[in-house]
Amino acid sequence: MWFKNLKLYHLTQTLDLTEEDIQDKLAEFPFRPCGSQELATMGWTSPVGQGDMLVHSAGGKFWLTLKKQERILPAAVVNAELADKVALMEAETGSNVGKKAQQEMKEEIIQRLLPQAFTKNSFSHGFISTQDNLVVVDASADGKAETFLAMLRKAIGSLPVVPLAKQSVQEELTHWLTDDSVPNDVVILEEAELRSMEEDGAIVRCKNQDLGSEEIANHLSAGKTVQKIAIEWDETFSALLQEDMAVKRLKFTDVMTEQNDDIPKEDKLAKMDADFALMSAEIVRFSKRLVEIFNLQQDQE
């Protein structure tokens, strides 16, 4: 349940929605399994993995889960069967099979094999904090986050969001190393990516490296800027913070993840609820801290 990545978005307009409102809207787009001739389907499912509720509320945050099912039909399987059919037809007719005919044959093979193909399920989690004008998606790639937002926008009708950081904060991240201006609640770890500002410039990726070393200082003096940097924040989690404010490899500390261990293991729903309330509150607190640290403009229409 603990998020592994963060894509942070600012709501430019207040969303006046209750848990019941969101439930009703998501219920119009529920997940359903792939039909026999469908490559993929997508829809909303229970965040806690049981029951009919498509939204879980805790501490004023609404937890949502998008489920995708795909049929796994390897291209190699299709192409191998296509090659056999083309070879057989050419042997029988003595002439080459044209591209159009091959495409039609390929589509016929896909339609025949699809119902037999295995399916794979994947899940995208996120939450809305209307009181904080914040939307958070657990995604490492922009495409996955944008799909989540697009499906949410389709369901609720309007989702006026912009990235938390509208422009790169690479200069500020670089100053953390060049000017020793690291915020008090941030600890710099031993991983970073530095990039030259020149077109097709050099990229330096370092791991298990003292970022205060002379070697790193030389790269910075040569004009490279920080694109990604590993941090620990306020004894709450470690992560890789990017210049666009995306957060990857998020790992909450044991102190955090063990806070609710007093809840009986058999009461899984209560444990999930408590963990989500704790995690989402810390993510909101972190996002507010990012706004302060980088002086991000949070316009409201």
From Swiss-Prot:
Protein name according to UniProt: Recombination-associated protein RdgC
Family in the record: Belongs to the RdgC family.
One Gene Ontology biological process: regulation of DNA recombination
Disulfide bridge partners, by residue number: none
GO MF annotation terms: double-stranded DNA binding
Function: May be involved in recombination.
A GO CC term assigned to this protein in UniProt: bacterial nucleoid
Domain of life: Bacteria
Location relative to the cell: Cytoplasm, Nucleoid
